[in-house]
């Protein structure tokens, strides 16, 4: 691949931001139902109980810490999009929580909450694949498994399961919510992402074709 022009970088970064916003809408829906969230946000929920900050600020601080560690491990993992994910991920969650908090909460009927969790899985998976296909960088929390897998020469799938389990275990011990939403996320998001990946690739290619 040749060197990217400034215009292409801007388009890819904007595409990443759209995907990030979609993905974190899914994360917010998980949390508002109080039926459990994705592994990393179970961890963040637990940490958040120990701080006076919002969930979004705690999320941003943890992503910043991961980036600092990666700077010492191997800075090649960090791209411009990684920093964007760190800076915008938390505030996006806080923004959606403010907008939707009065509409979606744990007082809703369980079947409705389960439907919302299912929708959250699909929304998260679609947004995540847009971020990946933008090829502008990956979220810091996703880089944990990538870095460990490559540095220890272990299969990524196995490492990702161990990392996710560790996030959940530590999060629950700190007071994070583990529930059916976490299980839904574990089984549905990956499958849905596999379906969405070629669709998202076509979307990103179409955007680049129309804007270049």
Predicted regions span which residues?
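Core subunits and conserved enzymes of cellular information-processing
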Residues: 1-212
């Amino acid at each position: 691949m040749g060197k990217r022009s400034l215009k292409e970088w801007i388009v890819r970064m904007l595409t990443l931001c759209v995907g990030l916003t979609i993905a974190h809408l899914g994360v917010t829906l998980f949390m508002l139902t109080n039926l459990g969230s994705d592994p990393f946000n179970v961890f963040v929920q637990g940490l958040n109980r120990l701080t006076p900050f919002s969930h979004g600020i705690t999320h941003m601080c943890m992503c910043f810490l991961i980036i600092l560690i990666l700077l010492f491990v191997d800075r090649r993992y960090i791209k411009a999009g990684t920093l964007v994910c760190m800076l915008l991920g938390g505030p996006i969650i806080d923004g959606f929580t403010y907008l939707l908090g009065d509409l979606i909460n744990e007082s809703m009927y369980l079947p409705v909450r389960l439907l919302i969790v299912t929708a959250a899985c699909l929304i998260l998976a679609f947004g995540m694949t847009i971020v990946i296909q933008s090829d502008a960088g990956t979220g810091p929390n996703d880089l944990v498994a990538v870095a460990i897998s490559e540095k220890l020469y272990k299969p990524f799938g196995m490492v990702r399961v161990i990392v996710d389990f560790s996030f959940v275990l530590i999060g629950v011990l700190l007071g994070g919510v583990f529930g059916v939403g976490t299980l839904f996320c574990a089984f549905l998001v990956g499958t849905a992402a596999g379906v969405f990946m070629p669709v998202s690739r076509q979307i990103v290619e179409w955007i680049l074709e129309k804007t270049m």
